């Protein structure tokens, strides 16, 4: 773990490195295998890196809450864990905490997000991670029947033995779909031969926040960027209580010969036969 620039911290796990900017919203700015970047490096707002919001979105709508998305986070490094803590938003009355650590044995970087209810009221909220990647020559896939994705017809997901696969395309409108997956979401960058996999809690029906979902894919208009989104369970928090939600990040080289081989690589990374 190193502090290469003011406010920016780098975690390294084998060939993989993750850069987090505590000075600007605790965002994950970079995720690399050796020197090959896998997440978006665009410069205009809300187009780069990986961030964290509270769900449902209807509670704050837009733009993202500055205390969670853009303002500085306090930093603590202790026993191999890098912890970043946000300010409290006056309207929502939550504090966000992000804890980063490496899992050398499984070659993963583990991110645990916490939402703390600092209000004097009982609240309901869900965690929500948003990771942006380039819209060029990639493949997005997860475990769910293609005909279960909603709204139907917005993106051309194809079914491959129960795996929904989407080759990003271009449209003159913003598009977003929802899915009930199986606790993982993957992105293949064909140009760089890299496979990004994020693993999280597998939700069941009724657990996501209203009008939200375990897995969401947002494609920005044109050929710009895509958001890989995952959400945890909609949770009741009493005053002073917190929820904790963990996402495990994996990144490996990949040159699969088929979709079956690609899915098998994911299962090997996650060490699951499911």
Residue ranges of each PLM-predicted region?
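Sequence termini and other peripheral, non-core segments
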Residues: 4-6, 14, 274
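Hydrophobic core residues within well-ordered beta-strands of beta-rich domains
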Residues: 96, 109-111, 243
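Acidic-aromatic substrate-binding/catalytic surfaces of carbohydrate-active enzymes
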Residues: 8-70
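Extended, loop-rich substrate-binding clefts of extracytoplasmic carbohydrate-active enzymes
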Residues: 1-3, 12, 57-106, 120-125, ...
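Terminal connector regions
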Residues: 251-274
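Residue-level detector of beta-strand face positions
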Residues: 8-10, 30-32, 83-85, 114, ...
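A contiguous, surface-exposed recognition patch within enzymatic or periplasmic domains that forms
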Residues: 9, 16-18, 23-29, 37, ...
């Amino acid at each position: 773990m190193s502090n290469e620039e003011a406010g920016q911290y780098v975690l390294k796990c084998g060939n993989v490195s993750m850069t987090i900017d505590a000075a600007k919203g605790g965002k994950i700015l970079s995720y690399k295998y050796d020197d090959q970047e896998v997440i978006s490096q665009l410069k205009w707002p809300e187009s780069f890196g990986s961030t964290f919001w509270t769900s449902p979105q209807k509670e704050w709508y837009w733009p993202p809450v500055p205390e969670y998305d853009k303002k500085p986070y306090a930093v603590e490094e202790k026993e191999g864990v890098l912890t970043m803590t946000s300010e409290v938003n006056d309207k929502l009355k939550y504090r966000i905490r992000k804890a980063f650590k490496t899992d050398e044995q499984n070659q993963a970087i583990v991110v645990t997000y916490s939402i703390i209810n600092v209000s004097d009221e009982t609240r309901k909220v869900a965690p929500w991670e948003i990771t942006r990647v380039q819209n060029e020559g990639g493949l997005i896939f997860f475990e769910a029947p293609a005909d279960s994705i909603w709204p139907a017809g917005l993106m051309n997901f194809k079914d491959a033995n129960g795996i929904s696969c989407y080759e990003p395309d271009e449209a003159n409108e913003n598009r977003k779909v929802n899915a009930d997956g199986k606790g993982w979401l993957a992105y293949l960058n064909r140009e760089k031969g890299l496979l990004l996999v994020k693993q999280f809690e597998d939700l069941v029906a009724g657990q996501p926040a209203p009008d939200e979902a375990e897995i969401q894919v947002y494609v920005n208009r044109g050929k710009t960027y895509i958001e890989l989104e995952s959400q945890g369970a909609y949770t009741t928090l009493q005053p002073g209580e917190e929820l904790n939600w963990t996402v495990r990040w994996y990144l490996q080289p990949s040159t699969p010969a088929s979709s079956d081989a690609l899915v098998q690589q994911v299962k090997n990374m996650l060490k699951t036969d499911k």
